[in-house]
Structure formats: C-alpha cells, structure tokens
Amino acid sequence: MKQLILALDVMDGEKAMEIAKKVAEHVDRIKVNYPLVLSAGVGIMKRLSEIKPVIADFKIADVPYTSSLIARIAFENSAESVIVHGFVGSDTLREVCRVAEEFGGKVYAVTELSSPGGEEFMSAVSLKIVEKAKEAGCHGLIAPSTRIERLREIRKAAGDMEILCPGIGAQKGSIEAVKYADGIIVGRGIYASGNPAEEARKLRRVLKI
C-alpha cells in the first residue's frame, strides 16, 4: 500500500504537534528534519511518534562510528527509521543498518536530491548508490519525483526495495512518481497551507493513495 508522508519542517515543537494531530488521519508517517529537532529538541520525535511513526531525516553523512551514534540517538528517541546519504559508502551504510537492526528500525539511503543541485554530482552515481544500499542491507531509498526519468531508472535498479519520493508540491515534482514510489513525501504543500488536514486529504485523493 502506498503512503503519504508529511515532511514536518517547522521550527516550533508545539506547532509541530498541533499540525501532526490535525493531519493524523490523512497521513501514514511523519518525517522530521534538523529545523524541528534543533529548535525543539530531539525529544520531539518521541512526542510525534505517539501520533504517527517518525522518520528521522538526518541525512546521516559521516564516518561509520559517528554515523552510528547519530542513528542510535534517533532510534533511542522513538524514530521508526532514519535517512542516510548513500554517497557515504558501504562502511557507513552497513554501520547504520547494524544500529537500525538493534532497534528493529529501517534505513533509507538518499540516491539523489530532488533539488536541481542533485543533478550536479549525485545523478552520476545514484545507480551505484542503489547497488551499495542493497548490499549494505538498507530497507529503502529516497529518490526524486522531480526527475521522472531518473526515478524510473532507480526503480528498475532497486527491485523490491521501498522507494520514498520527495518533491511533489513546492518543488513541482510530477505526480507520475506515484507509479514508481511506495511513499510520497510532502511538506510545505500540507503544513504551510491554510488547512493542513484538508490539503492532506485532497492529496490522497489526487494521488490515489
């Protein structure tokens, strides 16, 4: 079953909780990033996890030991899964997956960013990242809805790995991404609207998920 994932990139913990409660019946998971965690504290993930499963989008990108510590902090604070940059290489990917396994969590590797800059360096190696992520034991991938031709190639290489796609909404990603993705990540299009719950409901209908 395909999922709608809220990227909750606000910088106020109470506002985040308010939005999460409003949209809870219309989204499947909540993705948090540095803006919220750095402003509200890492404990906000525990609070949000009482509403919906939380993806810690820390885009982990360091040496294996440091990356393992970041992953551990996320899982100890009730994250269901973490996001790691795929370009860090096999050793870091394996170490993050090892920590995830301790907690029964998931790891998603970024293949390429959905922003235009993602094409400058990452597109050239994204299929190699898919290969390394598979070998390391990652559960899934992050791939762009903003470049459908790239998403098609990543889907083909990924096989049955789960793919989550950001970029629909503010970044003008294509709704065609739904064909290739297991989850669609939407942020500003939901939380910055006048009625987040209604916007999330409409998105589910439009995307047929």
Swiss-Prot record:
GO terms for MF: orotidine-5'-phosphate decarboxylase activity
E.C. code: 4.1.1.23
SMART domains listed in its UniProt record: OMPdecase (SM00934)
Binding-site residues, substrate: 9, 31, 57-66, 114, 166-176, 187-188
Catalysed reaction, written as an equation: orotidine 5'-phosphate + H(+) = UMP + CO2
Pathway(s) served: Pyrimidine metabolism; UMP biosynthesis via de novo pathway; UMP from orotate: step 2/2
Active site, renumbered: K59
GO biological process assignments: 'de novo' pyrimidine nucleobase biosynthetic process; 'de novo' UMP biosynthetic process
Protein keywords: Decarboxylase, Lyase, Pyrimidine biosynthesis
GO cellular component terms listed in the entry, alphabetical order: cytosol
Function in brief: Catalyzes the decarboxylation of orotidine 5'-monophosphate (OMP) to uridine 5'-monophosphate (UMP).
Subunit (UniProt): Homodimer.
Family: Belongs to the OMP decarboxylase family. Type 1 subfamily.
NCBIfam families attached to this UniProt entry: PRK13813.1 (NF010386), pyrF (TIGR01740)
Record's protein name: Orotidine 5'-phosphate decarboxylase
